Amino acid sequence: MSISKIAKLAGVSTATVSKILNGKDQAISEKTRQKVLKIVESEGYIPNAIAKSLKIKNTKTIGLIVPDVMNLFFSELARGVEDSADRLGYSVILCNTDNNSDKEKKYLQVLQSKRVDGIIISAVESNKNICFSNCITPIVLMDRDIETDKPVGRIKVDNIGCTYDATTHLLSKGCTNIGFISSDTTNVLSRDRLKGYIKALEDNNMPYIEAAVYLKDYSIETGYLGAKKLLDNNKIDGICCGNDLIAIGAIKALKEKGIHVPKHVKVIGLDDIFISSYFDPPLTTIKQPIYGMGHEAVNLLIDMIEKKETNLLRVLNHRLVERMST
């Protein structure tokens, strides 16, 4: 069903139909307006959003690219983006890269071809060569310190501060041999989390022992394997984990060895994904405002789309959430 067909059925011009559909019908009689709207409803007319966007130069659509939508961190982040975008009248196209830099590049191209107004991206950790030079669409980077060849918005937390505070908390609980399990240091985020752990040890006159560190990725399996390895070689009484999934895996390994958490080994995570409070034991963690990060990313992106004067870097606060694992 086209506008011309509606106009023919209503016995009016296409210009009249267009004005009614776009709310610019002040000079049109109520009788004519109701007649056109009745035909529109009965015929199931759906406006061509892409064609309309070519005239008004926007699609009211934003793209969201995440590395792993199955990771509860990114699920909550995506919800924050979607809810905030919806309140502002925007739709969201979600793209999952599976931590694949080639898919990431493809999705950047696809989203631009769909004429999205802006893109929010949590880039693949290992993708050091991500290039935005050919991307005219406004971009906001989520929690990633990546050098870019064009100005982009950035939403961050203080990753050094997160693990510094986590390690300091374990020390305050009497831990003297603290292990660290996290992702490998191929990106700034992971390097900063390791730095925070080391700095906390140094500031408290505790030795940094390389054998007490296990680095792989941000998965439950990493926590499980890492805890088993640390226990084989060290008298660990505390474990600082790079995220909550790692902490959950570590606690599973400890339980299998008959080690009580927190009596014998205390464990702290990072993120505060929703399952952390329901785990056994409920997980002490450093809370990142995950949902709020999504909300703030949308606000920043809209400011960029509307070409408002704005600070392109926004650093959000973290805080300790103490539960039963420490």
Stretches found by the model and what they are:
Residues 67-75, 94-103, 144, 155-165, ...:
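Hinge/beta->alpha junction and helix N-cap segments in small-molecule ligand-binding domains
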Residues 1-59:
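N-terminal helix-turn-helix DNA-binding module of bacterial transcription factors
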Residues 30, 43-110, 114-117, 195-198, ...:
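Amphipathic helical "hinge" segments at domain boundaries
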Residues 121-165, 186, 245, 271-283:
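Flexible loop/hinge segments that line or gate small-molecule binding clefts
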Residues 16-19, 54-68, 169, 177-184:
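Short beta-strand segments enriched in small/hydrophobic residues
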Residues 228, 233-326:
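Flexible loop/turn connectors
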Residues 108, 116-123, 179-181, 213, ...:
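Periplasmic-binding protein-like
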Residues 176-177, 208-212, 260-266:
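Short acidic capping loops at alpha-helix termini that bridge into adjacent secondary structure
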